Design a protein with these regions (language model features):
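Structural signature of FAD isoalloxazine-binding scaffolds in flavoprotein oxidoreductases
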Residues: 88-91
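Short glycine-aspartate micro-motif
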Residues: 62-66, 72, 105
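ATP-binding/phosphotransfer module of carbohydrate and carboxylate kinases, centering on a glycine-rich
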Residues: 2-5, 23-31, 48-60, 81, ...
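Short beta-strand scaffold segments in enzyme catalytic cores
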Residues: 72-76, 95
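N-terminal glycine/serine-rich phosphate-binding loop of ATP-dependent small-molecule kinases
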Residues: 1-41
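Glycine/small-residue-rich loop that forms an oxyanion/phosphate-binding "nest" at active or ligand-binding sites
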Residues: 34, 40, 44-46, 55-60, ...
């Protein structure tokens, strides 16, 4: 949520961007509600109650990654969520990855999300193979389909490049 306008932004469910979703839901449900970014909730829960707490109990600085139809992230510093001035702290999915990449709904081109999200990888596979497949099916064919292999190699290569920028900036204890 934009901290000033209270409107949703940077959602890969683009029809929700620009909406006062918290206010809308509160009015529809006639209840007070709270809304948070999924990546922030995930990384906070893992840090305080989940696998980070279990395996690295003294950890204070964590970067959590959400990947699916979109690409997002959450930052924990000193065991607190970092929202940033505009409420988009951790949103590495909108960091530049390819200068000549596809347009992103955020208004930029070549964002991480336009390269390694599930949707982006399915689009890439279709472009090089002419076939439309879901990412799980592409992955299942990676050993006997050269286009599927190339798609998964693209994911691995660009995931590493994108994440290396986060690591160099944040230097988290755990990802």
């Amino acid at each position: 949520l934009d901290p000033i306008s209270k409107k949703l932004k940077n959602s890969n469910s683009q029809s929700l961007n620009g909406r006062k979703i918290k206010e809308d839901l509160s009015n529809i449900l006639n209840k007070k509600i709270s809304i948070q970014n999924d990546a922030n909730c995930f990384v906070l829960a893992e840090t305080l109650f989940g696998s980070v707490k279990d395996k690295y109990p003294k950890t204070k600085n964590v970067f959590g990654i959400i990947m699916g139809t979109g690409v997002g992230g959450g930052i924990i510093i000193d065991r607190k969520v970092i929202y940033g001035n505009q409420g988009i702290g951790g949103e590495w999915g909108h960091s530049l990855l390819l200068d000549d990449g596809d347009d992103c709904y955020c208004g930029k081109k070549g964002c991480v999300e336009t390269v390694i999200s599930g949707k982006a990888l399915e689009k890439f596979y279709k472009k090089i193979s002419g076939k439309k497949l879901k990412l799980e099916d592409i992955y299942a064919k990676k050993d006997n389909d050269s286009h599927a292999k190339k798609t998964i190699e693209r994911l691995i290569n660009y995931f590493g490049k994108g994440l290396s920028n986060v690591v160099n900036i944040l230097d988290p204890d755990v990802i």
